[in-house]
Amino acid sequence: MNSRRREPITLQDPEAKYPLPLIEKEKISHNTRRFRFGLPSPDHVLGLPVGNYVQLLAKIDNELVVRAYTPVSSDDDRGFVDLIIKIYFKNVHPQYPEGGKMTQYLENMKIGETIFFRGPRGRLFYHGPGNLGIRPDQTSEPKKTLADHLGMIAGGTGITPMLQLIRHITKDPSDRTRMSLIFANQTEEDILVRKELEEIARTHPDQFNLWYTLDRPPIGWKYSSGFVTADMIKEHLPPPAKSTLILVCGPPPLIQTAAHPNLEKLGYTQDMIFTY
């Protein structure tokens, strides 16, 4: 992959802030948008290792707000970076009457306005066929890990780091790493990138398995309903093994009450689990 790295890289210094302009905005659903930001030139790539994410920084109400996002575009894309983001509006969630600071800021951005990007950030690096590097913390050196089957538990916009990996692995004919995903959402309308996930599952049936669970399923729903359970994990994800790695990303309740306790109950050890 690196032999063709002639393109200029945007994220040269992980501590620097790079102002990037909003060049396109697409409404994906009632509360989800795709934001496209322009890179310094049409030839630039972002320069983000697979497994890593970026931070967006903005001054909102005199306060510096920093949020982490995994782009859905990759370094095969030149001149732009795409983010899929769920907007947390005011007065929707009783616990968060103010809504999301950063997401509402993005929602109100006009084409041509800029926001600061910083990165790469992250503890997981995917180096190619089943080879991963995992940092125990942000500053340590990555520890080599080999996996032939990646299990994935994602909730809501926690799908973006999974999509980054799924796309990268299925695009590489030499990579036979298997992936199984449980994707949890509130309603059927909330399922992000559904079309793409189902297309990948259809074209790579031996490599990618897809399963959904919904809090409020429609009548006749053929997948699971409710929280991610131990039975669901047992049925749809690879069993505990040295060559199994389970990736988890989503809201805190999914991680703390559904994913981690059930994985531990089923005998997955700490080194078999990575939480974004």
Curated annotation (Swiss-Prot):
Pfam families: FAD_binding_6, NAD_binding_1. Residues 15-127 form the FAD-binding FR-type domain. Restricted expression. The lineage of its organism: Eukaryota, Metazoa, Chordata, Craniata, Vertebrata. SUPFAM superfamilies: Ferredoxin reductase-like, C-terminal NADP-linked domain, Riboflavin synthase domain-like. Belongs to the flavoprotein pyridine nucleotide cytochrome reductase family. This is NADH-cytochrome b5 reductase 2. The keyword Transmembrane helix does not apply. It catalyses: 2 Fe(III)-[cytochrome b5] + NADH = 2 Fe(II)-[cytochrome b5] + NAD(+) + H(+). NADH-cytochrome b5 reductases are involved in desaturation and elongation of fatty acids, cholesterol biosynthesis, drug metabolism, and, in erythrocyte, methemoglobin reduction. Responsible for NADH-dependent lucigenin chemiluminescence in spermatozoa by reducing both lucigenin and 2-[4-iodophenyl]-3-[4-nitrophenyl]-5-[2,4-disulfophenyl]-2H tetrazolium monosodium salt (WST-1). GO terms for biological process: bicarbonate transport; sterol biosynthetic process. One of its GO terms (cellular component) is nucleus. Its EC number is 1.6.2.2. It comes from Homo sapiens (Human).
